[in-house]
Amino acid sequence: IIRHLNQRSEMLSGISHDLRTPLTRMKLQLAFVKDEKISEKLSNDITEMEKMLNEYLNFSSSRSVEKTETFDLSELLETTVQKYEKNKITTDIPERVYLDGRKNLIQRCLNNLIDNSIKYSEKILISLKKSASNITITVDDDGPGIPENERENVFKPFYKIDKSRGDSKSSVGLGLSIASDIVRSHGGNILLETSPKDGLRVKIFLPF
């Protein structure tokens, strides 16, 4: 699994680098587009593509240099949640749950999951549990959810779902893919289910 993740990361990182030059050319060509509506749409598309590339390049860079450390996952979760709208998110997080891992990558994973839920829902519940064999992080929301037949697809890089969790809102198409890669690089697993709120439930299992 680790070898597969490394190969995929190297491939996507290479693609991301290769796409930067044509994107820069496209931005320069926008100056010659006279139709403002077309120019604005193209500019938005280019900006979204740049977000995709930058997010994956940042992930690849962090993954290659960050060392494993023991950190307080409970504290990291609480600190991460505080950056978002408090009226949207409730938590069920016990104190002092420790994890051996790459802290910045785990935070990026959490940010991606919360960002995804916030786009499509009004209420989010984040819970943390520790058992004898693993740590479980659960993110429940009340959004439109993801159809069961699409749940494996959303972990594919650049995959975007039509209609359900909306193509009406911008999505970098890499958030869940990167989250999945981070979890699996820690020897864990990530599953998508229907939440008790009839939205999406994301469950992360991490060994410790």
Region spans (language model):
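A residue-level detector for a conserved hydrophobic packing site
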Residues: 106-107
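Short alpha-helical Gxxx[C/S/T] motif in the catalytic ATP-binding
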Residues: 175, 179
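Acidic ATP/Mg2+-coordinating residue in the GHKL
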Residues: 141
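Conserved micro-motifs of the catalytic ATP-binding
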Residues: 63-66, 98-101
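Short conserved segment of the HATPase_c
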Residues: 146-158
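Conserved catalytic submotifs in the C-terminal HATPase_c
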Residues: 90-100, 129-132
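Conserved glycine-rich
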Residues: 187-188
